[in-house]
Amino acid sequence: SFYDYEFESTFEYSSEINSIVDGVLPDVDSGFPTDTEETKSEPKQPDTKPEQPSVSKPDSSVNGIVPGVSEPKPKQPSGSKPDGSAPGLKPGGGKPEGGIKPEPQVPITNLGSSTSQSSSYISITNLYDILSIIFNLSHIGGTGKGYTDRVSGGVGIGASGGAGGVGGAGGVGGAGGVGGAGGAGGADGASVGAGGGADGGAYGGGYGAGYGGADGGADGGADGGGYGGADGGVGAGGYGGAGGGAGGGDYYSDSSDSSDSDSSGSDSSESGSSESGSYYTGYNNDGSLGDNGRGSSGHRYSDHGSPGNGSPDNGTPGSGSSRYTFSDDGSLAYKSQDNGTPGRKATNYRFSDDGSLAYGAQDNGKPGSGSPRYRYSDDGSLGNGFPDNGASVGISPSIESPGGPVLGSLEDELLGSDSSDEDDIDDGLGGLGLGAGPGGPGGFVKTPKHKPRTDKKKKPDDKPKRKPKTSRKPKTSRKPKTSRKPKTSRKSKTSRKTKTSRKSKRKSTRKTTRKSSRKVSRKTSRKPRRKITRRPVQRKQPREYKQESPEVEREHSAPSTTNVEIYRDIIKILITSLTSSRGDNGKSGDDGSGSGNGGGDDGNGGGAGNGGGAGNGGGAGNGGGAGNGGGNGGGGNGGGGNDNGNDNGNDDCHYDDDDEHRNRCEDDDDYREKCCDDDESGGSGNFDLSSILKLMQGQSGSSSSSSATESESSSTSTTPSTSSLDLSAILSTLSGRSQKTRSGSALDISSLLGVTGSRPSVATSRGSGLDLSAVLSALGGGKPSTGTTVTSKPSTGTSSAPGLDLSGLLGQLGPILSGLLGPKPDSKPSTGSPSTTSKPSTGSSSGPGLDLSGLLGNLAPVLSALTGGKKPTASSKPTAPSTPSKSTGSSPGKGLDLSGLLGKLSPAPKPKAPKPSIGSGLLPGLDLSSILGKLSGGKKPISGSGKGSKGSSRFCRCALSCSCKSIDYGCVNIGCK
């Protein structure tokens, strides 16, 4: 078994570690899922254009963490969302089901021994979620706000007067702007606004926004005003509204007949009349402002270059609408967004002056043709970036939202070549403007999804027009369904998984961990045997450093054992501290409360199951949303209907003692089936992010063994005020510098790298979260290798597509830990003495073992420079004996002796707290200070000296075969064999 093999190795440390673990670290048996738990399915990459409605449960789960996908300019939501999720987390978006989707477990392949892989899985869900919180990885597609930026915000919103209301709704994605247009006619607009707007807001926001900018708006907005995205506006409120409305009726029916818009368009007097203009275009055919200078709700230029619509557009050369316009002279109108030079393509969608394609396939500059989104009048002048062109030819909503198939050829559709009646078309235009109110539903939205669209030949007709709307509505109603379906499937998946894996998992992890912790004496007595078998191997192959060879793996499992064990314990603590306070989680009754749904739909029981949705959390239940108790307390009542089932459940599942409950979850299959969550039985462990946030902010009252004095640190670091974890505070605590933390930033990498002495050039991009690979490679000095899969050997800075490649991260941590441990420096590997130090292959991870000595090698010069040690030669080969310097700085060949560094960095000769500690703000449950103190040779926080190595004084932990002495602020290495 993994732990037996790995941790009962030849090192005196293992017993010490065990005593440390038993004394300090909570024992987490269920923290490490075994391989049986491994999720086989590929992680689902959230679509950039989420087809699932991103209507997420208003619970604390993080939806839509989209690792690498940066969105245009997502605005951080200000304040907390109505659903109570943390400020940085916008609900909605990526994942259809609520709750954290269990990510595939990443096998830690670098634990030193190939046989040990099987049971060493760490749940990425936990670490990844933590990291995503830290780095704000989550892009919640949820609200259109981001797009509002693109839209230039107010465009649609205020623009169309009453429509503005719609637009407002559209607020989503600014699409609203267009929607606003839809809102035509104030009053109507308002109604639309309410319907369209509200919906738009809702869908557009949740949905359209997710769709992404213009296109997103289109789809999302379509539902509500959301259409607005930049262009979406059309479909959204504005268009939908307009078209949908009465006017829409006229417009559609006529246009559906489709007439020779080629001729009729330019002739139409209605659209061109100097007063009316269409509601959208708002220009007369001669280019003068129509409708009292209102211009379209969106953005128009008049021919003479005066602003078409107040703030959004301005025809003067060089100025531009907030969205996309060309200056009259063809110079850039809106920064890099648009450019009128012929053939030049605008970021958004422009035609070049010569009518050639400006933006990919999106638009076509031939006069009178155009994409569903932006139209030209027949004479080739700009119609209205949006739905219609200045001639009377409009675009019927059914035509297409951007990005989807267009029904029939654009020209036929748009120009209505079949149309028999010009007047009809004219009416249509009028309809656009007027109909807006009713149109609100502007159902035109989800066009991309909606099937009728694929019928290319069908000319829009009244019925089809409306049908899309109705068919669209079902879609909206279907949204919840789709979001729910994933959930049920997920539930069955997890239950299947836990069923198959629980027994074996319990057998392996629980037993072995207990064995390793309890039967220390046996373990130590067993050690010599292993020593004997392993050392000869090393002697035989003293020089073989091939990273791939299994012998070498075994050779290095020596050091990695220590590291791994400690690392395992640290991970355990992390996981424990994140998951252990389950009782507290339950208290957040909110999830279950209102409906008793068991924390929203997430209810464990899958409805009735655990207490049923209703009883489940009831809030009151232990599990809170998760509803451990299944309505432990009042859960049963919560559901009302569910009472019976729940009450029974309550009796069975009632427990007063969390530990007892946890044990029963492990040992008693029936009890587990009824009363336990996945994570309680050692499953993939979803946990309540809100509690993690609380933990990270240090708000949770429970701190484990760290007492105030233990974690007292002489350097003052401000605890980060936001939910994001500010590592600079931790680093400043370590380094004894007090740095003011940036409350808003997710992670101040520059200060992180600055402290470690690497180049602080890693830019954190707000949108895409933090690219850890860059950080890791900067720390490790290696080139980030891209594209490695999750199971591949760790190479510095690998990032895998769906989630973080923790193997690389673990690989990075290994050497740091071994450095902290100060493994026995081996200056003469060639003699065959067991090598407990990893070889300094600069910046690259070596094989499956936790050997990233390259990182240590790179850091060593920095550290020795910091500590004033003799600068070691970074190029020293592993086989070349490196003379151990007596100074506290160490050479790359041997393990890093951080004790000197930490001692040097501690401020003042006699600070109150003798050992460097990480500020307790990190995770109250995790007392890294004692671990670091111990690892770095600080005073031993816990009395009782495990088996020490030679020269260890009671409070000073030396590296193996080294002697050291305690001094008032730490430990000094006297010398090593």
UniProtKB/Swiss-Prot annotation:
Q: Which residues are glycosylated?
A: 136
Name listed for the protein in its UniProt record: Aspartate, glycine, lysine and serine-rich protein
Composition skew (Low complexity), residue ranges: 251-278, 572-583, 700-724, 803-814, 822-857, 870-907
Which segments carry the region annotation Disordered? 23-116, 246-767, 780-922
Q: Does the keyword Secreted apply?
A: yes
- The UniProt regions of compositional bias labelled Basic and acidic residues, in chain numbering, are 37-50, 541-557, 660-675
Tell me the first and last residues of the signal peptide: none
Q: Where is the composition biased (Polar residues)?
A: 51-63, 309-325, 730-744, 758-767, 785-801
Q: Where in the cell is it found?
A: Secreted
Q: Name one GO cellular component term.
A: extracellular region
Q: Which organism is it from?
A: Lottia gigantea
Q: Does the keyword Plastid apply?
A: no
Query: Where is it expressed, tissue-wise?
Result: Component of the acid-insoluble and acid-soluble organic matrix of calcified layers of the shell (at protein level).
Q: Where is the composition biased (Acidic residues)?
A: 410-427
Q: Where is the composition biased (Gly residues)?
A: 428-443, 591-643
Query: Chief subcellular site?
Result: secreted
Q: What keywords appear on the UniProt entry?
A: Glycoprotein, Secreted
Where are the compositionally biased (Basic residues) regions?
A: 447-457, 465-540
